[in-house]
């Protein structure tokens, strides 16, 4: 297998407390021999099932990291998305997928629990997820 064929991009939030999102999927894929690129969409003080979580939006960082990887010529055999903090983040991933046409794509539309959107998310996020999932 070519070295670039083992690169997987993980796009998800990073809770500083909790065993979900980037904290969960990374170790499994790493143990399977994949080279992982982690692209955090937001950094949270804790998981969103608590009454309060401090959040840092990572949209601008995502833009810069994707540009840096493009400059290096990094290609991905797989792209796995989870929680997206803004609809603009879906646009960034769609732009990447237009360049990386052979990547296997898995979209997990993490945006709600119990029929209610997570704080700060809404219909625009749902539409962005629909567009991304249809790719």
Predicted feature locations:
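Soluble or luminal CAZymes and related metallo-dependent hydrolases
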Residues: 58-61, 85, 89
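Conserved beta-alpha-beta core of the PfkB/ribokinase-like small-molecule kinase fold
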Residues: 81, 87-135
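Conserved residues at beta->alpha junctions
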Residues: 12, 83-84
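Small-residue (G/A/S/T)-rich helix-start motifs and N-terminal tracts that mark the onset
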Residues: 1-78
């Amino acid at each position: 297998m070519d070295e670039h064929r083992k690169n997987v991009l993980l796009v998800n939030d990073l809770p500083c407390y909790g065993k979900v999102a980037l904290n969960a999927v990374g170790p499994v894929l790493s143990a399977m021999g994949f080279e992982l690129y982690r692209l955090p969409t937001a950094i949270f003080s804790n998981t969103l099932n608590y009454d309060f979580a401090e959040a840092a939006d990572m949209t601008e960082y995502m833009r810069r990291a994707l540009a840096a990887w493009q400059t290096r010529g990094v290609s991905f055999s797989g792209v796995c998305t989870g929680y997206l903090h803004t609809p603009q983040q879906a646009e960034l991933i769609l732009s990447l997928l237009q360049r990386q046409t052979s990547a296997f794509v898995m979209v997990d539309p993490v945006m709600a629990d119990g029929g209610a959107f997570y704080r700060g998310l809404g219909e625009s996020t749902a539409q962005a997820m629909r567009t991304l999932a249809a790719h």
